[in-house]
A protein has these predicted regions:
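Conserved ankyrin/ankyrin-like repeat signature
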Residues: 75, 112-113, 137, 169-173
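Ankyrin-repeat boundary/"N-cap" motif
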Residues: 54-67, 88-104, 123-130, 151-165, ...
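Terminal, low-structured helical/coil segments at or just beyond the last alpha-helical repeat
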Residues: 173-201
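N-terminal secretory signal peptides and thylakoid transit peptides that target proteins
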Residues: 1-18
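C-terminal segment of N-terminal export signals and the immediately downstream linker at the start
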Residues: 22-62
Length: 201
């Protein structure tokens, strides 16, 4: 049987535990936070070394912005007012599943949020163009590289998925994508939430 801890030993352990971040991801017990994968170079280092003169954006702030940009335009704008550099910040949800606020709004079919983000300088991509019904842009991208028909956006969502969630405004894009590669499309779970409900008169 182990000897009982002295008061001094107990106090030392308690103080040390207070300095260790909780594995529960904060007081609300939201689960463990992100963990960076282990890595060691097995190739020569690049000849250029970053100076890191400016601090990186806070990861929690980036996470919150990207999440709000999926469905809450007011909060997205509020966070952009607080930190304009969030507009093109990307969150790695794990294993290289990168997502920006624009990517989140796009795969949710939220044209209203996409328009806000574009006004703030978000970098439009092929997935956003597909959702917005920008047929010429999608055609140009696929002409540049036909294999982009199989490209995956945030969470693995395809170009077809983005065109589908765009609804009627992107039917032409979806028809074009289907003419290149016919997919058996399942009902899009985000289509019903693509636009906010209109207030009752």
């Amino acid at each position: 049987m182990n000897d009982p801890l002295s008061r001094r030993e107990f106090a030392s352990l308690w103080a040390g535990a207070a300095l260790v971040p909780s594995a529960q991801g904060g007081p609300e017990g939201a689960g463990p936070g992100p963990v960076e994968a282990a890595f060691e170079r097995d190739y020569p280092a690049p000849g250029f070394a970053p100076s890191w003169k400016k601090p990186q954006l806070n990861r929690l702030l980036v996470q919150d912005f990207v999440i709000h940009a999926h469905s809450d335009p007011e909060m997205a704008e509020k966070l952009l007012a607080k930190e304009p550099a969030l507009i093109n910040a990307a969150m790695d949800w794990g294993a290289g599943d990168w997502e920006t606020g624009l990517g989140g709004a796009s795969h949710m079919g939220r044209r209203d949020i996409v328009e806000v983000l574009l006004r703030h300088g978000a970098r439009i991509d092929l997935f956003c163009a597909a959702m917005m019904g920008l047929l010429d842009a999608v055609k140009a991208g696929l002409a540049l590289e036909p294999k982009l028909i199989d490209a995956k956006g945030p969470h693995g969502f395809s170009l077809h998925f983005h065109a589908q969630v765009g609804g009627k405004d992107s039917e032409g894009v979806l028809d074009h994508l289907q003419s290149i590669k016919k997919l058996d499309l399942k009902p899009n779970p985000f289509l019903k939430s693509a636009m906010p409900a209109k207030p009752k008169a």
